Amino acid sequence: MDCTQVGDISLQYAGDTDAGSRRDHNEDCFATEPRLGLWLVADGVGGHAAGEVASDLVRSTIIERVTAGDSLVDAITLSHDVLVREIEQREVASALGMGSTVVAVKVNGSEYEVAWVGDSRAYLFGGQLQQLTTDHTRVNELLAHGAITPEQAHNHRDRHVLTQCLGVDKNLQITPGRVTGTLKPGEQFLLCSDGLTDELSDTVIAGLLATNKSPKSQVDALIRAALDMGGNDNVSVVVVGDFELSEQDLETTHNRRRSSDASRSRREKFPFKVLALLTALCLLALWLLQ
């Protein structure tokens, strides 16, 4: 488990990804960037390892643009343009269907912004599980119009047909979803690819988050449960939020900060020591010349 201070709030986080039981490669990726207050999961699509390239390019572009000061929505939108250019430069066969979903959260103090494209999800957990994102899928559109029931949606043949996906169609107008809010004490974010939500119900996910008290144990338990249910797809999970630290975690965090403060203090004192030494040498030289 890693800890970071974002504004006036202390966050703990963990992330992991697994190829699953039926795939020979992993097209998912994730990022934990505490210096930016940024965490994300991307799920690549496309054959000939194109999905791996797509998700990695989306990840690196978003990190680069957020670092440069872009908003989260603008960074995601730009990653679509970057991916489209990459596809145009590749051979048709290797770039066929190349694209990626993404879900990301950016935290500034207790305020947060979640943005996404596709069916990778963000949840908020504080005893109860709340889905923050809305899947950009054909099935979700049918649900919204009352054309099918939630029960029909779960096994619908078009449940994985995306209406928004980065890179796949250069003519598609990408409109990332976006929600904002305030993170309350004891609440955590769960970011995941559909490899998790296809295997586990919200009830099961909530139970695993409730019974595991650290982000690392939550991530491990969720991925393990998805694999136990079949692991039919790559699965990626990131958990970040406000956890009550154990005494051991508090001591580790304190030691890291103390070590960092000591290193900074030594760096700050070093120029003065050099200046004092040079001054002493100059005085000695003047005395010898007399």
Please annotate each region the language model reported.
Residues 1-290:
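PP2C/PPM-type serine/threonine phosphatase catalytic domain
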